[in-house]
Amino acid sequence: MLTLPIKRKWFNMILSGEKKEEYREMKQYYRVRFERCGLLKNTGFPVWENRCWIRLRNGYSHTSPSLQVLCSMRISKGNSDWGAEKGKVYYVLKIWEVKKEERN
């Protein structure tokens, strides 16, 4: 499962259901990872009908709080209320379902 770090503010907004999208810059680093999980074709275009589970972790430690989110992808401008820079184009992860991971 692809794991992506996320800031606490956005983590909490996704967990509460307030934030419905997560944004990642249009960089080769993310393109490769999204291709591997099936959200992007090797041409760089989103596979609209595909959804996959991604782990969003609030920090870099394996013990940091994390969520599993079922996502689909599009390439678009983001919502500035949810952390996107105005007018900038992103990989937009549309969040369909959220599961909080419990640590023992």
Go through each PLM region and give its residues:
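Catalytic phosphate/metal-binding cores of nucleic-acid and nucleotide-processing enzymes, i.e., regions
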Residues: 1-104
